[in-house]
Swiss-Prot record:
Origin species: Saccharomyces cerevisiae (strain ATCC 204508 / S288c) (Baker's yeast)
Keywords on record: Hydrogen ion transport, Ion transport, Membrane, Transmembrane, Transmembrane helix, Transport, Vacuole
UniProt subunit comment: V-ATPase is a heteromultimeric enzyme composed of a peripheral catalytic V1 complex (components A to H) attached to an integral membrane V0 proton pore complex (components: a, c, c', c'', d, e, f and VOA1). The decameric c-ring forms the proton-conducting pore, and is composed of eight proteolipid subunits c, one subunit c' and one subunit c''.
Residue numbers marked as site, Essential for proton translocation: 108
Cytoplasmic topological intervals: 36-61, 122-144, 205-213
Keyword Zinc: no
Protein origin, superkingdom: Eukaryota
Entry keyword Transmembrane: yes
Name of the protein described by the UniProt record: V-type proton ATPase subunit c''
Amino acid sequence: MNKESKDDDMSLGKFSFSHFLYYLVLIVVIVYGLYKLFTGHGSDINFGKFLLRTSPYMWANLGIALCVGLSVVGAAWGIFITGSSMIGAGVRAPRITTKNLISIIFCEVVAIYGLIIAIVFSSKLTVATAENMYSKSNLYTGYSLFWAGITVGASNLICGIAVGITGATAAISDAADSALFVKILVIEIFGSILGLLGLIVGLLMAGKASEFQ
């Protein structure tokens, strides 16, 4: 009984703390907005002005960084899930360790996808003149590389997790019955295609973006 009440108190504490942070941020945003409104500076809160005044180089570099970063996180996460299960199951069945290394390779390919796309995107980062920095062409290139990088990075992140979970299941199933490995490997291959789809979509999104001028 004491243990259950202690668990309830801990969950209630976590619940209250998360809500406290949420309402604190909400109150700060509302107070700041009302302050700007009642002091005659309501026009300062202008998201469109923020987009137009922010350098397109920042958006492009941020998209490239997210592309590589999320892809590496997805690959590392998948390798962690697959590797821990493979090592644990390999204690009982050492024969599975070599065969299940293909799952680690599938996870590592996810990071390579992100690196390739980052290299392709970085080729558009040429030096622009100060007069044409905020031209329509440069703004489009910056926004395009930003959202394309997020698309590729998020796809590779999800792909790495999916391949990692499937690879872990394949290792455990192979330890119990070697005939199940090939069947689960087919599912793992379909999961790895998710990263390839994100790569193609990212190339299509940034395909019409010209170099900075």
